[in-house]
Amino acid sequence: ETFDVLVIGGGITGVGVALDAASRGLRTALVERDDFASGTSSKSSKLVHGGLRYLQQGEVNLVYQALHERQRLRRNAPHLVKVLPFMIPVLTKDGVVSRKVARALGSAMWMYDLTGGWRIGRFHRRLRKQQAFTHLPTMPAERLASAYLYYDARVDDARLVLTVARTAAAHGAAVVNRATVTAITKSPDGTVQGAVVEADGRRIDVRARCIVNAAGVWADDIRAMDEGRHPDSIRPAKGVHITVPWEKVRNDIAVVIPVPKDKRSLFVVPWGPKPDGTFRFTFVGTTDTDYDGPLDDPQCTKADIDRSEEHTSEL
């Protein structure tokens, strides 16, 4: 069989491409060298958010698109994508609240709602100090002046990938993991004809009219097979989350910590709900640094942990 599309990579991008192609009637195959979602797609912050921080950078159109897609995911996978409240604390400095900061946060909240945040069915609101404190009782009360509450969503990222992969298969796609691409095959005139795949000790020639490289941080390895040299076009970055016992933080909703000098934010997200309304863990992250180590086994360093603790110490 000759496929119309061969997708290389079984993360959320790859399975999404496979589903899109298969649902349009294209003969589609997807191969993943490891397990589905074994890369970045199972190591995210577990959030489906519109990118509030991108408003700080003037990326209004990006936020609009992200919020539109958030609503699409809520509609298509309501069993996986759930509404999650977020709180942004308004902090004091030497007992004084910066009115400029408070006004800027309020303006950002309205812009987020009007850009598309309203689609979740709730608008942001201001919380008094005591209301905010109940959501993060381990925070020094003297630092907390008030807070803003808004809404985004959370998701089990790996389950979402598996669900999309199964849906692609239901539309006729051939979806295979533990299958490694070892070569790109071409016709005498240089046209791509498919790929050589190794699976279960067998060498399989997969013919395809089109190849989509969705290999994530390994995309340059696939390009090297095609171009004959390593292009070095991917700039790997490492984002680290630290996981702490929930009892250390006791936040019942997600908390956003702005990092002004980096123009970004850290998320403090409860995870693993228990029947009594508490949680098993809290995720704190993510950092964002360049990475030049082994891609197959990235490690968290003491510097990564120190960086996260530096930004959360005042909470």
Question: Which role fits each region the language model picked out?
Answer:
Residues 31, 79-85, 181, 205-206, ...:
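Active-site substrate-recognition segment that forms the wall
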Residues 1-13:
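Beta1/beta-strand and adjacent pyrophosphate-binding region of the FAD-binding site
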Residues 46-135, 265-266:
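Dinucleotide-binding Rossmann-like beta1-alpha1 core, especially the glycine-rich loop
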Residues 3, 201-210:
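Core beta-strand elements of the Rossmann-like FAD/NAD(P) dinucleotide-binding domain
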Residues 133-171, 194-196, 206, 287-296:
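Helix-loop-beta segment of a Rossmann-like dinucleotide-binding subdomain
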